[in-house]
Structure formats: C-alpha cells, structure tokens
C-alpha cells in the first residue's frame, strides 16, 4: 500500500530516447548530397575482403531484407538475388541501366539495383555526433542528457515540458526537426515514464509504426500500455538487456515472453513458475529482469550521471583479418600490451592484474588435418559454427604498475601458458583490471614477513636499481606520448611494429577498429 501511495505522489517522469537513423550511412549520404532515405549505401571497408562487417546499411537497402549489421558478402548475395528477380520482370529480360536510388528503381523495373560501398570515417562521424549533441543542448541541460552511444541519447524531459509548454512528443519532434534541418539526418524516438520504457518504445514499438514524410518515428509507452502491447511480444531478444543466453535459459523453462516472466514472478511457492525460479537462473540479476517484465525501472537520470564503478578496467581487443599462427599472434599480443601500457601512463593509472582471452579460428575444425590433431573442447560460436574453446587466463603482478617491461613479461608468460601452439588464432582481448590512480598507489602501505636468511641490504639495493630502471622507462613512455600526440600515433614505431603480421601501425590509424 505504501509503495502505491509513493508512486501516486511521485511526479510522473518523461524520458525521451533518440536514435539517429542508420547514422553512419546517413552521414555518408549527406556528404554526397544524396537523400539518406532513398540512397542504397552500406558503410564497409572493402579492403578487408567481403567478409568484413558493414557498420551501417541505409533504410532503402534494408527494404530488400538486408539486416542492419551484415557481412559485406551477404549484401552482395542479396542484391544479386534481387537483380535476378528484377531481370525476369524487365522487358526482354534485359536491364537498360542501373541506379542506387530507390525512387528511380521503383519507377523503372528495367533498372539494375546498384549500391554505394562507403569506407568508414570514424573521426568524421564523431564530429557529426558532437554537432548533433550541441543541438540537443539548445533545449536540454547537459545534466539531463545521457549519451548512450555515438548515435543514441537518453533525455530526462520532465522539468522542460512546463517550460516549453509542450508535450514530450512535441519536444522530441522539435529536437529531431532541428537535427534534420541542420544535418539532414532523421531519427527515431521513444517516450516513456522511465528510462527502460523510452528505450523499449524506441527499439520495438517505433519500428513497427509508419514513418512521416521525413522518416521520423515516435512511440510512447507507460507501464500499462507496455503490458498491453508487449507482454506477448516475441522474440525476447528484442528487449533491452535480454541476450541469446538469457532468452535460451528462459525458454528452456517455458518462459517465452515478458508476460510469462511477469506471471512467473508472482507464482505461488508451490508452483514451478515462481520468483525463486528466476533467482535460481539469474541470481541478483533476476531483480532487474522482473522489474523490466512489469515495465518498472527505478534508476533515474540523476543516478545514472552520479554512478561511479567500484572498480575500473581498460580493455583492448581485435579480430584479426586472417587466421594467425601461435608466433604471429604472440607478436600482436605484444603490440597490444605495449599500446595498453602507454594508455595507462597517459591516464596516470596503474594495474596489478591482466586478463588475456584468445579465440581460435573455425579453420581449426574445418581443415581435416587440423581437426584430427585437435583433442580439446569444442564450443558453438555466435554464428552456430563449431570452434575450439577459447583460451582464457589471468596473471597477477607483484606490484601495481604501468611499466611496459613488467606487464609485457607477465602477458607473454601468460600467453605461452594458456594458448595452444597448434591452433590458428582469430580474436585477441587484453584487459587491465583493478585500475587505480598512480598517486593513490604510492600511498599504499605494503608489508613483508622478515626472515633470517635474506640479506636485506642487497635486496634494498636491488629494489632501488629496479626503481631507477622503471623511472627511466616512465620518462621514455611520457616522451613517446608527447611525440605521438603532436605528430601522430605512427610518429614513433618499434621494430616489432614493422614485422610481418604486425597490426599496430594500421590500428593507430583507426578509431574503434575502423578507419578514422
């Protein structure tokens, strides 16, 4: 009863989630003075072969059944199928030309479907994103905006509706129209009484409504309309934070929709479907799942902005362009470690724990000779293919440090220990855990058990010499950072960066693993 009274007395919140439509593709279209809604365009790096993942697909290409993040060869195959069908309908089964504009293609069936493959320009997309964020700032204070990604934001509009004498829908439309007028990029928006509902309104409901003439879609949800519209919605993976693993586990227990989860949460103790079942499956995360099943989300914008994690980490990962053998992949791991330690020095952070994960290539099992030799565990990857189980390990350092020398030695030892020398490698991830500010690290007291057999005079001298070496290394790292910031990341390269199979030189010219 008290909970219901509290909800009644609490001011109704209004949250807006805005997602820029096919952002990367839209930017590339506008830079070519083309309409993002009618131009067939994919953003992908063709130099990486047709297996490369497309970063974005324009809306007109999606109309042919192409998903949002396909491999480039999937786009090629789909358009080939579309053109085969169009050819049969064309006069004399012959194309008279080609076009990458959906308006022209719809008007003339004798045209072959064409499309533009635009190489990614991540730095340029970041500039566009910053420009659009500044448009939001014309209407909303920064403390009420949470950038969720490069093309998506959450906005707490509660205190602005009275100021502007607008509804949440009108305010959302005003901001989207301003973005469209300034940049030519349209958007989809969701409005909800909490952050979860506005996200779901945008991700699920808005995508099933008809857009206006500018391609804008806006949907609204509150707790009750969420239950009416989406309790029977499938698949579960359409919902925020429900991945394939969650969905599979729920379906194995007879729960196929959010309505099923909600009903399970109020089941009686003597029934199979009850709250305890959810906690057995997901532990404390079941609390969040149950809240979301009912359309509740207690976390506010203020809490999101104030959140500070208990522990911090820095992660670096890459998918190799082709399978690497043990030695070539070890070189890449060494490069990645080197760059990570420079990043730690730049941020004045130190670590005492490194985690390494190495994923193996599918060729290890498709090649008959390699398959016969492999006796280890086999898992299924995200594409449903059999691959050797990945290698995963952790190494703890004796001290908190950002030293390239100490961390690299530890990572190389870990790599040799956990990685199968006979397997081809495709993915590498390195994480530095338990990060703290280097100034705090120096203040930490350390203790040591003394014994009668150690010459502590010699030991202190060795420690002093090690500190001197680490101090020289630190100055060298800082000098390298200064030069790289002034003249570019490739202004200074090490010998290993020029060896066959090295990737650091190319990655220095990328942002997020894609061309800058």
What are these regions (language model features)?
Residues 1-516:
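Basic, low-complexity intrinsically disordered segments
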